[in-house]
Structures are given as C-alpha cells and as structure tokens.
C-alpha cells in the first residue's frame, strides 16, 4: 500500500516575502537529471528573495548554495543538470529594481569548488518552462506568450522557432524524450522516409548534432535518431465565447515546429479547478465538483476522450495536484498531503503538516528491497516549504496497484507489513490469559542458562529413533514438570510457568519430523502429546523446520497426522508463512471446514497483498480459485455464515486478494463465477445503501445523548403539536418538537426515569418515520 513516512527538516530557508503578482512564482524546485535520468537524491530549490540551493536528500543536508540579490524573483521552475562533478542550473530571474527578465545559469564543481553565475539576455520576456535536450546539449525555452525558442550551446544565442495560439494561456509544458511517444515517432519516421520533411532548420541541426553532444550524455543510439522523435507537449486553455477550451500542442524538437494540435473533450459542465497532463502526454487529469476525470488519447479522433470518473471526498478544497507516478496523484488540501490511487479511486494515506505547505518537487526511484518485479515499489521524498523551513516527507508506492491494496486497512508506516510477527506471537487469534509471549520466552531463555537438559535430550532422541511415542510423551512431560518446579521462583518474574528454553524446544521439534524418499515432510515420531504441547504454548518454530529443505507444506503434514494439531499450528505459530496459510485455505475449501477457513482467512489478512497473492498462486489451481471465490462471496453476502470474531473487512480484503490472483479472465472463465460476482455486487451495493441510511440516524442519536439530562431537569408545560411530522430545520429543535408532539397527560403520574425513557423512544420513532418519508 502507499504510505507516507515521517517529516524531517533540511534547512531554515522559508517564504518570508509574499508575491501576489501574476506570472511570478514565489518558490519552486526540481530534480537533477544525471545522464538524462532523474537523480533519486539531488534536488534544486529556488526561493524568492533568498536564492538557489541544492540539497542531497539521502544525507539530508545542504549541498551547495547560490545567494542572489534580495529583490530577485523567478518566472519558472529551474532545470538542474548533473554531469559528473559539474552541476548546471538554469532559471529565469529578474530584479525588482529594473524588472528585466534574463536567463540565469549557475554552474559549479563540487570537487574543485568552482562556481560561476552567468546571465543571458532574452529581450525581457518571461519564461514559462525550460527543457534540456541531453542528446544535443540544447535548451528549449517556452515563453509565457506561447513562443518556443532554442538556446544553442555553440553560438550561445536564442533562436525563435514556433508559437502556439496567441490567445492561449499556458498551463503545463512536458518534454518527452525519444521513443517515449510511439504515435508521433511513427509519424515523424514516415515523413522522413517519404522525404516530406524539407525543413532547413532540421538539416542544419542534424549536421551539427555530433559536435554538441556532451561527453557525459552517452546513449546507445545516434543523436540523429534521438532528436527525430523527441517532443515537447504544451497544455493550454483558450477562451472562446465565454467557454474555456483545452488543447495539447505537439512540438517536434527535430523539425522545430508544431506538428499537431489535440483537443481535450471535457464532459464537465463547469471548467475544472485543476488540470494536469501525464508524463508521456497520453492522459489528461481534471478535478472538478463532479470528481476526478481521466481522459485518454484517442487515436481515431486525435483528441482526449473521457474514460472514467473517480469520486473523492473534499474534492473542492484541493489547492495543488502533482502526478507522482502512473497510478498515484499527490494532492494538497489545506495543511494535508494525500496520496490518491487513480486505479481504483481510493485515498491511500493522508499526512497532516499542521500548516499550509508549498510543494516544491519530489524524487522517485525504484526500491531495491525486493528483487521480484511484481513486489517492487517506488520510493522517494517530497520537498515542501513550510514556515519553519524546508522539509522532506518520504513516501512509498506500489508500482502496480492491486485491488487488495485499495481495500486493505493500513496498520503501519513505511517499511512494515500490515501484520508483524510480534503481534501474531502475542496470540491475536486465540490468546490465552496465561500464555507466554515471544518476548517472555526470549527473556527466560537468556536469564535461565540450564545445561542439565542435555542428558534428557539424549534419552529423548533414543526414544524417537525407537518410535516409542508413549514413553517419549511421558518423558517429555516429566522433563517439563521438573523444569518448572526447579525454576519456580524465577518463573514468578515472568508470570508464567509454561516456558522451556527455546533451543531445547527446537531440538525436540527436530526429533519429531523427518524427510521421506520424495523429500516431503513427515511425522517420524508420532508423539502427539509433545507436539501438541509445543504448538499450544507457542514453542513450535516454523523457521527451524524449514531449514530441513523439504518440499510440500507443514500444514498438510500435520493435517494428515492430526487435524486438531494442524488447526493449533495455524493459529498459534508466530512465524508461519503465507504459503502455509494458503494450503490451509485450500484444505478448508476441499473439506468444507468453515472454522478452519475463518482462521486461515484471518491470518492471511495480516500479510500484505503481494505476499498473499503470490502464496495463493503457488498453492492453488484455477478450480480451487473458483471454489474459493464463491465461498468468500457467500461469506460476504450471508451474514449468518460470517464469524462474530472477524469483521466484514477481513473477508472483503481476502476476496480482493483472490480477485487480484484470478484476474479478469479467471473470473469470466465460467458462468458460475459471473453469477457469483453479480450476486456479490448487488449485495455490496445494498449494504452501502443501508450504511448511508444508518448514517442519517447518527445526528438524532447524538441529540438524544446531548439533551437527555436537560429533558429530565426541565419542568415546563407541554402542548400538543398539530403537525407531528413537520420538517425540522434545526436539529436542536428536535427534542422540543417531540415533547410538544406527545400529550403531556401521559407523562403525569410517572417517574422521572419513565418519562425520560418515553421521550427517548419517541425521538427514535420520529427519526425512523422521517427516514421513511
């Protein structure tokens, strides 16, 4: 699941002076491009009246600083290029004294500590965005008036190339490198093959491409091919007859001209409050009162068409929006940051900063904690500017959003699973009052260093080899009793008398199991009393048993041996794997054991969605998935089948894991699955309707609690109300209306408690009648 980490401050830089002028940004930031790839650690921050600073996110420190005059202001976000030890930062600045806008280049060497600031004249035009072409070393300049120009590194001059609609208001500019947009790449390639491209500017630029490629910008393809497919996309709005229309223009870097214009066909009645373009320009996201609308590029109509609308809470209070990945939006509303899942439409996590922030930039890189692609996550830092200073908030996102992640309940922060072994070791399912915890076991194992059990272990080993199970159980229980009596005083410290040293318990466990000819686990010594004691007192270690390197499942082995022991193993073993739980679910489905299924589902809900899904895929076949899907659907639909110990959320989470594992094709593979899905959908929709109706009763119930004492204390004359079902606008008048509605004669002669009870019943009855109306 997606989640935030804990905030930490980098420096005391902050927004002191407020800028309310149009086309001026008070503060902004960007991520360094290292050989054309976004760096996960280096960011650049510019703050009005204070200067430009570079920070290292991993070390959480200031890396370099470029102080500027006090009255310096900015018109665009900076662009940050890192080539070895050299750092290059471009931005558009102006002094408030003369008001002339220029391009600022700050370059420094972190090894030799060299630094230089250079200004370039741009005829006093404000810049909207800057883009760096790594293959040619050129800088693409997008001015606020819609003009597009190039800053050539050879002659160090600005060359105008194209311009968008004169009445356009630029909203976003996005640079997409080569091969990132196949639609425009194929079109440009066909033009070059047919010889329709006769632009002299392109020929001139391609001829000089090789000499302008930076040494650090090494690529595996030629610069000519790279520049032929690189595009700059401009999202802008145009006012036509009091109607705002949105368009996306495609600017070819190689041809240096606008190649096409695509319209955004909005479905909203009113103009959206926020509009955003994806990084590859194939999607448009708009936020309005109707919800979050997602538009996708339609090839035939050459426009952006609506594909779905997602509804979120507090959608009218949004102040800032950023596309943090392909599946998540970073939203700021008031002082809160939130991660919105745009796959299923859920708010994954919310972080309250206690004060309104300014989002500067964010880093994003693939986590290397897990090797498998489906387990990989995106992690990074969000840089925000607060009154106290510059701060960063870490976050983590799943690369592929699963349904189970959308419906799962978060119980922990970054770096932790939904359930931990410590919680399971405490016995969250079948915890006994006198049962020991893993902490108590470890504490006693450290405090009580006993070597007298070695002789007992040797004798038990000989009994196990002889398969004398009766004497083995008697011998083991005798050892336990003598051990408890010997250390009775020490056990008072731990408040338990049922603990053995953990190494001794693990040694006993290894005597009970062995491998057969097919390398499968089997109970070689059927000492059920000993095995039951180890499992019930949580001394059984699954991790120790796994070291034998067997194939198959421990649960299946115990289930064949004795069903009660297998059930206790499922509930009381702290380090059990998700695969063992999946095997238990499969056994419960095939044998129709409802109690076993409930316990297995409860244990499965403690794992993260990816681990649970992989365990099910490893243990199940398609026929087993069909049976499990129908069974879980019945548990969700029929409340009589569900256990009182586990809430409905557990079943819904496990059902979502099953749906992720089956996929759309698996659900649609049979008519029975489709019928079960239809019944499940109708039932969940009915439950949501009932919950909505119940939520309307809450104000009336709170009114009862708030006014009950006041009603008892009041002694006034009551009169009958001629309109008992009149609509009450103010909830505070509800109790007064009901007191007038019911005849005061019925209250005469009754006790104070009886009168209060009658009023409570009347209020509840009135509430039900109003809901029916």
Swiss-Prot record:
The keyword Nucleus does not apply. Residues 192-219 are annotated as: Disordered. It is found in: Cytoplasm. GO terms for biological process: maturation of SSU-rRNA from tricistronic rRNA transcript (SSU-rRNA, 5.8S rRNA, LSU-rRNA). Signal peptide: none annotated. InterPro entries: Utp8_b-prop, Utp8_C, WD40_repeat_dom_sf. Keywords: Cytoplasm. Its main location: cytoplasm. One of its GO terms (cellular component) is cytoplasm. This is Uncharacterized protein C1565.05. The lineage of its organism: Eukaryota, Fungi, Dikarya, Ascomycota, Taphrinomycotina.
């Amino acid at each position: 699941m997606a989640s935030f980490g804990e905030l930490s401050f980098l420096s005391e830089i902050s927004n002191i002076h407020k800028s309310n002028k149009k086309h001026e940004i008070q503060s902004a930031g960007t991520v360094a491009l290292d050989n054309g790839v976004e760096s996960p650690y280096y960011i650049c921050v510019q703050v009005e009246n204070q200067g430009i600073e570079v920070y290292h996110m991993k070390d959480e420190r200031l890396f370099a600083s470029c102080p500027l005059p006090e009255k310096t202001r900015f018109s665009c976000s900076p662009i940050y290029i890192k080539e070895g030890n050299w750092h290059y930062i471009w931005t558009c600045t102006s002094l408030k004294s003369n008001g002339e806008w220029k391009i600022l280049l700050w370059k420094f060497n972190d090894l030799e500590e060299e630094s230089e600031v250079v200004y370039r004249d741009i005829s006093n035009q404000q810049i909207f965005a800057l883009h760096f072409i790594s293959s040619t070393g050129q800088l693409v300049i997008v001015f606020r008036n819609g003009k597009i120009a190039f800053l050539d590194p050879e002659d160090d001059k600005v060359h105008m190339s194209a311009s968008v609609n004169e009445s356009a208001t630029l909203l976003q500019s996005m640079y997409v490198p080569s091969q990132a947009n196949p639609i425009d790449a194929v079109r440009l390639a066909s033009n070059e093959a047919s010889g329709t491209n006769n632009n002299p500017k392109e020929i001139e630029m391609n001829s000089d491409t090789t000499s302008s490629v930076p040494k650090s910008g090494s690529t595996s393809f030629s610069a000519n091919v790279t520049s032929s497919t690189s595009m700059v996309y401009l999202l802008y709005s145009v006012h036509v007859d009091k109607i705002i229309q949105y368009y996306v223009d495609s600017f070819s870097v190689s041809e240096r001209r606008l190649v096409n214009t695509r319209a955004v066909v909005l479905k909203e009645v009113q103009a959206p409050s926020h509009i955003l373009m994806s990084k590859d320009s194939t999607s448009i996201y708009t936020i309005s009162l109707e919800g979050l609308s997602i538009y996708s590029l339609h090839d035939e109509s050459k426009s952006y068409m609506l594909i779905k609308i997602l509804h979120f809470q507090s959608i009218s209070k949004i102040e800032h929006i950023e596309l943090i990945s392909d599946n998540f939006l970073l939203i700021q509303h008031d002082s809160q940051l939130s991660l919105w899942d745009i796959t299923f439409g859920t708010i994954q996590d919310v972080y309250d900063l206690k004060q309104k922030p300014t989002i500067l930039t964010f880093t994003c890189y693939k986590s290397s904690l897990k090797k498998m692609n489906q387990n990989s996550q995106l992690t990074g830092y969000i840089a925000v500017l607060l009154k106290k200073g510059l701060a960063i908030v870490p976050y983590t996102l799943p690369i592929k959003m699963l349904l189970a992640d959308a419906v799962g309940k978060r119980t922990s922060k970054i770096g932790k699973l939904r359930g931990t072994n410590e919680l399971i070791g405490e016995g969250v399912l079948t915890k006994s009052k006198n049962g020991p915890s893993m902490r108590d076991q470890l504490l006693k194992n450290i405090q009580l260093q006993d070597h007298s059990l070695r002789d007992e272990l040797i004798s038990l080993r000989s009994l196990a080899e002889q398969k004398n199970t009766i004497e083995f159980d008697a011998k083991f229980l005798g050892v336990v009793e003598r051990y408890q009596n010997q250390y009775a005083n020490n056990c008072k410290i731990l408040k338990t008398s049922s603990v053995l040293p953990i190494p001794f318990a693990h040694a006993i466990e290894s005597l009970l199991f062995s491998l057969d000819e097919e390398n499968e686990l089997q109970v070689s010594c059927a000492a059920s009393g000993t095995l039951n004691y180890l499992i019930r007192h949580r001394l059984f270690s699954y991790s120790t048993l796994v070291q034998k390197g067997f194939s198959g499942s421990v649960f299946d082995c115990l289930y064949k041996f004795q069903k009660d022991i297998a059930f206790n193993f499922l509930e009381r073993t702290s380090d059990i794997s998700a695969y063992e739980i999946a095997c238990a679910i499969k056994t419960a489905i095939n044998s129709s054991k409802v109690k076993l299924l409930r316990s297995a589902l409860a244990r499965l809900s403690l794992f993260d969605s990816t681990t649970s899904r992989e365990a099910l895929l490893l243990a199940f076949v398609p026929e087993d998935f069909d049976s499990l899907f129908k069974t879980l659907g019945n548990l969700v639909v029929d409340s009589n089948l569900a256990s009182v110990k586990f809430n409905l959320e557990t079943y819904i989470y496990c059902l979502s894991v099953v749906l992720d594992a089956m996929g759309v094709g698996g659900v649609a593979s049979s008519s029975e699955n489709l019928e079960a899905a239809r019944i499940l959908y109708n039932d969940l929709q009915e439950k949501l309707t009932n919950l909505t109706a119940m939520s309307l009763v809450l104000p009336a119930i709170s009114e009862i609690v708030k006014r009950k004492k006041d009603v008892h204390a009041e002694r006034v004359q009551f009169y009958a109300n001629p309109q008992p079902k009149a609509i009450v606008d103010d909830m505070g008048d509800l109790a007064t209306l009901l007191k007038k509605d019911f005849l005061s004669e019925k209250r005469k002669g009754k006790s104070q408690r009886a009168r209060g009870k009658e009023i409570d019943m009347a209020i509840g009855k009135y509430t039900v009648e109003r809901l029916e109306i």
